[in-house]
């Protein structure tokens, strides 16, 4: 994953862990709209893996997710930077030295063996990064080398990641509480709600949730960008016609012959471009 620079060089995107629905392909669009908004505050309402805030600079970055496990991860990195790195290093080295045995159990409720929030956070990051497709619900074996290289890369860029996260304000709120708290002139909201019908997330969105989000968006004082899969046409009845649609090469399509070559993202915004 590469990001552009003004001198036409490219550098890798910062990425803490594998996670479903990461936004690397649309980060250039998000950054374009955010810059055009001229806002100081960037609120990622459905922050997930943090891929957006990690790669789009803002004066006041705000991370939010309703998943308390994700919030624990970023809070641990922000407030216990070196302790988290030490625990992650030990965990990764244990995995790198494993010899073909299962190294990561299926993700579920945090075990009682996790004696503190740092261990819980490290185990959560590792469980996603060593699972198939970043889904966190299956496990990898020592025969698979890709996730080991991924974890090594995570350690290599950890200092850059933690420095970025140190400036974040981190919240664990429902979007209905979050929006009124931060809505004002100068605030930019990025909304990327869970995809309908997917089982990737611990907290799925119902049609009533989308309807509530649409109501909040209509009364925003600040600026926003909302992204949806354009194939979810039922959502068009809720949000109306998108401001624009973009096509992206389907990475999964390269591996599965039955997949579509391109996927289409619908974007909604009140930012003039």
Residue ranges, per PLM feature:
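SAM-dependent nucleic-acid methyltransferase catalytic core
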Residues: 2-17, 21-26, 32-36, 80-190, ...
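Short, solvent-exposed loop/turn segments at secondary-structure boundaries
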Residues: 201-205
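Short active-site oxyanion
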Residues: 38-42, 59-60, 165-169, 219-224
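Class I S-adenosyl-L-methionine
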Residues: 1-25, 244-267
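Short His-Asn-centered micro-motif
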Residues: 45-46, 64-65, 171-173, 191-193, ...
């Amino acid at each position: 994953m590469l990001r552009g620079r003004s001198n036409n060089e490219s550098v890798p995107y910062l990425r803490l862990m594998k996670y479903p629905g990461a936004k690397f392909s649309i980060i250039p669009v998000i950054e374009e709209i955010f810059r055009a908004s001229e806002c100081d505050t960037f609120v990622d309402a459905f922050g997930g893996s943090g891929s957006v805030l990690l790669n789009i600079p803002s004066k006041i970055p705000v991370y939010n997710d309703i998943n308390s496990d994700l919030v624990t991860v970023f809070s641990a990195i922000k407030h216990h930077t070196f302790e988290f790195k030490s625990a992650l290093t030990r965990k990764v080295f244990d995995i790198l030295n494993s010899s073909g045995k299962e190294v990561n159990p299926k993700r579920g409720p945090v075990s009682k063996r996790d004696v503190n929030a740092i261990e819980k956070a490290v185990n959560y990051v590792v469980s996603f990064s060593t699972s198939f497709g970043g889904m966190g619900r299956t496990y990898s074996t020592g025969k698979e080398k890709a996730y080991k290289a991924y974890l090594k890369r995570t350690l290599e860029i950890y200092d850059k990641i933690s420095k970025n996260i140190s400036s974040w304000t981190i919240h664990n709120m429902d979007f209905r509480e979050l929006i009124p708290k931060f809505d004002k002139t100068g605030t930019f909201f990025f909304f990327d709600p869970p995809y309908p019908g997917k089982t990737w997330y611990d907290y799925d969105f119902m049609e009533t949730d989308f309807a509530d989000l649409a109501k909040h968006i209509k009364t925003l004082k600040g600026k926003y960008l909302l992204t949806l899969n354009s194939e979810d046409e039922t959502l068009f009845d809720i949000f109306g016609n998108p401001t624009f649609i973009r096509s992206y090469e389907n990475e999964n399509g390269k591996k599965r012959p039955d997949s579509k070559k391109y996927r289409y993202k619908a974007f909604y915004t009140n930012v003039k471009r």
